Amino acid sequence: MPQQIVHNTGVNYSLYYNVLNYFKTIMRNHPSIQSVTYGDIDTIDDKSYPEYPLGNILITDTSFGTSTTTFTIQLIVADKQKLLNNESSGSTNAQTIPFYGVDDMVDIHANTLAILNDLTSYTQRGVAGFEINSDITCTPFSDRFDNGLAGWSANFELTTHNDKNRCLFFFN
């Protein structure tokens, strides 16, 4: 069931859980993503997530500024590679496939990059609570995880406001 995304500047996006929940929500609401995970994608059991493509969220680093929190985010969108067989006969069902090969790698890379573009574009322009101030670096992969997954990884820094409330702790 899709979750509602509310444009709420009152959400404290400097909290780790709120950043994770934001990306989990937009990934679950994307029409092409079938399952969403968190953490190191090397540990994902591909038998536990039979629905593809899958989205994965990982916060790799965090730094505190004077009034900001900056998260280094890695989003991965991956799909399971499938072998393709050219079963058409030349006389009845000839097709011109510009990138035909033994698997669907080009299709997976095209689709997963488009999904990452959707997710990062929405994050850049649709949310008032944080900003992506630098370029988003996307890297394709195919044999990186030794589990038949292929797709793209996007890395970027997400900056949020952090008021660092000093009234929360009293020292004696």
Q: Where would I find each of the regions flagged by the language model?
A:
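Small/polar-rich, solvent-exposed N-terminal microdomains that initiate assembly or binding
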Residues: 1-68
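Extracellular/virion structural assembly segments
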Residues: 2-20, 67-69, 77-120
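A generic structural signal for ordered alpha-helices
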Residues: 35, 53, 90-93, 97, ...
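Acidic-leaning, charged glycine-interspersed low-complexity segments
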Residues: 47-52, 103-159
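Oligomerization/assembly interface segments of phage tail-like spikes and tubes
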Residues: 67-82, 148-162
